[in-house]
C-alpha cells in the first residue's frame, strides 16, 4: 500500500502525500490466524515481509486494526465458527456461547497485546474494546453496548495504551524477530 500498483499504474497513496496512513490488513489476518492456532513462523513471516519492505516512516503509521467496518469482528473470527461464505440469515442468528466467548476474550487480549506492540499504531474499531461480536456488515456494525461493556477488556486496552505511551520503543523502536518455531510467536521491541 505504500507504493501500490492498481488499475495498471503505480499508485502513491501513502508516499505520494495523498494519505496519512493505510489499513494494515496483513497484520490483522496474521494475528487472527495465530490466535486461531496458526503457525507462528508463517505469521511472523507475514509480519516480517511488511517490516522488511516498507520504509520506516510508513511502518510507524500503519493502522493496526483487528476489526473494521469491512471485516468480521475480531472476537467472532477468533472464537466463532468460520464464515465460509455463509449467508446473511446464518450470520444474523449466530452468537458466541459462554465458553466460546470466554476463550475468545482470552485470545482477543493476546491479539490486542500484539496490536499495541507491533510496528504501526493501534486502530481500535469501536466496540472491540467492549467485546462486541458479529460477522460481516451489518452484523459488525451494531450499537455500542453502553452499560454492558466487557470492563476487563476495556481495562486491558487502557493498560496497553498507557504502556505504549510510556515506552517509546513501542511506537518508534526497532523490531527483532525471535520466534523460535511454529508454536510460539516472540519479538523484541
Language model region names:
Residues 3-7, 43-48, 105-107, 125-128, ...:
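Short amphipathic alpha-helical surface micro-motifs
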Residues 41-44, 48-50, 84-109, 162:
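Aromatic-anchored helix/helix-loop segment that forms the rim or "lid"
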Residues 54-58, 72-73, 118-122, 164-171:
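Short secondary-structure junctions and interdomain/linker hinges
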Residues 103-104, 115, 176-177:
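Short Gly/Pro-enriched turn/cap motifs at secondary-structure boundaries
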Residues 124-126, 130-189:
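Glycan-recognition and catalytic regions of carbohydrate-active enzymes
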